[in-house]
Amino acid sequence: MNPNQKLFASSGIAIALGIINLLIGISNMSLNISLYSKGENHKSDNLTCTNINQNNTTMVNTYINNTTIIDKNTKMENPGYLLLNKSLCNVEGWVVIAKDNAIRFGESEQIIVTREPYVSCDPLSCKMYALHQGTTIRNKHSNGTTHDRTAFRGLISTPLGNPPTVSNSEFICVGWSSTSCHDGVSRMTICVQGNNENATATVYYNKRLTTTIKTWAKNILRTQESECVCHNSTCVVVMTDGPANNQAFTKVIYFHKGTIIKEEPLKGSAKHIEECSCYGHNQRVTCVCRDNWQGANRPVIEIDMNNLEHTSRYICTGVLTDTSRPKDKAIGECFNPITGSPGAPGIKGFGFLNENNTWLGRTISPKLRSGFEMLKIPNAGTDPDSKIKERQEIVGNDNWSGYSGSFIDYWNDNSECYNPCFYVELIRGRPEEAKYVEWTSNSLIALCGSPIPVGSGSFPDGAQIKYFS
């Protein structure tokens, strides 16, 4: 190729490149006009590209009117599965952290009728869970809500300390018996629904149905009525089916993301198990339960969350904590129920079995669901000779109480141990106050342990039921 041909060829290439650049420029101008016009009508419609590198650094590239804004943020890692690696904190007394006064508010506000409330926490907060009756206190449908199992019941949650209303309550699942717990990543919930002789448990994980469990004894399949506990992605639940006043059939069931990975029939010396109050510690779960058949002493289930195995026995102390119950005994029983008049049927309760710092809760009345007290009984879980060392009144005996159970905020990073907490249900209405109202509902108080001694006080429901007449 001679010099003139080379010159013409180079000129042609330059002209072609110039035309291409001109076309690209026109395209960019058209795109900018289009984006600007679209942004005027939809100012939030910006283009965003997010890239996450291996160091968990997030690069956010936001294109606004052809301008790139780069934000560099450190991504918060997922909290991960809960590991029960701490022991219980020592407690010298109990302080109230929440009291919802639901019945007092219910005299003039639209408060939902509930029973069987409990408290359960997640990495962000603690909430109250309760089984509603499909009505509010002032609604005529509240008549007859003393019945435990109806088609209108379901589990709701509300911010702890707030009385449950239609506007602040979140529906969880349909049923008349429940338990719920968070594994650090998401929440698992179980509700039992249906007929007494043919009930079904529905299991939800991350608010999605994952498993169903059909009755195995055709006699009121039921579960804890307080929170379950998880360790390293496995959540354990105690469920019972069978007679309330005779030999029943209890299972300890292990779940992963809402699906069953193992079942165990009840082992050990406990004769009857219902409504367990469970808490986690040292890679174990301890459940303090209700013997509705024979024992005024409470049965205990100890669960190894590494081996997924359990055993059962009774709290050893002769200080009895069920209701109704006979007089306290000088010597307790570790492996057999303590009977006597008045004895059965019983009430849901709890305890924290922490060797020398063991605390047990019970109604003050041995016969009625009234009053509530916490008793410090060193080594009550293992020593039949153990005696009451300290007593703290929570609700005076001239006021109604009800179910009680344990809970723990496992995500409280301010402590090197798990601070024990509990709640007390304050039942109002029928059957004790049938003279004034036709409904049964409750308010709730929640308390947590203090590392130093505390003062005194009584925290009753406080509503004047005659105002509802």
Curated annotation (Swiss-Prot):
Give me the disulphide-bonded residues.
C89-C417, C121-C126, C181-C228, C230-C235, C276-C289, C278-C287, C316-C334, C421-C448
Q: What is stated about domains?
A: Intact N-terminus is essential for virion morphogenesis. Possesses two apical sorting signals, one in the ectodomain, which is likely to be a glycan, and the other in the transmembrane domain. The transmembrane domain also plays a role in lipid raft association.
Task: Identify the stretch(es) annotated as Head of neuraminidase.
Answer: 88-469
Topological domain, Virion surface: which ranges? 28-469
Q: Which residues are noted as glycosylation sites?
A: N28, N32, N46, N55, N56, N65, N66, N85, N143, N198, N232, N356, N399
The gene that this protein is the product of is NA
The UniProt record's further free-text remark is:
The influenza A genome consist of 8 RNA segments. Genetic variation of hemagglutinin and/or neuraminidase genes results in the emergence of new influenza strains. The mechanism of variation can be the result of point mutations or the result of genetic reassortment between segments of two different strains.
Listed binding positions for substrate are R115, R149, E274, E275, R290, R369
- Similarity-based family: Belongs to the glycosyl hydrolase 34 family.
Q: Which reaction is catalysed here? A: Hydrolysis of alpha-(2->3)-, alpha-(2->6)-, alpha-(2->8)- glycosidic linkages of terminal sialic acid residues in oligosaccharides, glycoproteins, glycolipids, colominic acid and synthetic substrates
Query: Which residues of this UniProt protein bind Ca(2+)?
Result: D291, G295, D322
What does the record note on quaternary structure?
Homotetramer.
Task: State the Gene Ontology terms under molecular function.
Answer: exo-alpha-sialidase activity; metal ion binding
Work out whether the entry's keyword set contains Transmembrane helix: yes
Where do transmembrane segments lie in this chain?
A: 7-27
Name of the protein: Neuraminidase
Using the record for this protein, list the coiled-coil segments as residue ranges, or answer none: none
* UniProt KW keywords: Calcium, Disulfide bond, Glycoprotein, Glycosidase, Host cell membrane, Host membrane, Hydrolase, Membrane, Metal-binding, Signal-anchor, Transmembrane, Transmembrane helix, Virion
Q: Which residues lie on this side of the membrane: Intravirion?
A: 1-6
GO cellular component: a single term: virion membrane
State its Enzyme Commission number(s). Answer: 3.2.1.18
* Post-translational modification note: N-glycosylated.
**Positions of the UniProt region annotated as Involved in apical transport and lipid raft association:** 11-33
The organism named in the record is Influenza A virus (strain A/Equine/Prague/1/1956 H7N7)
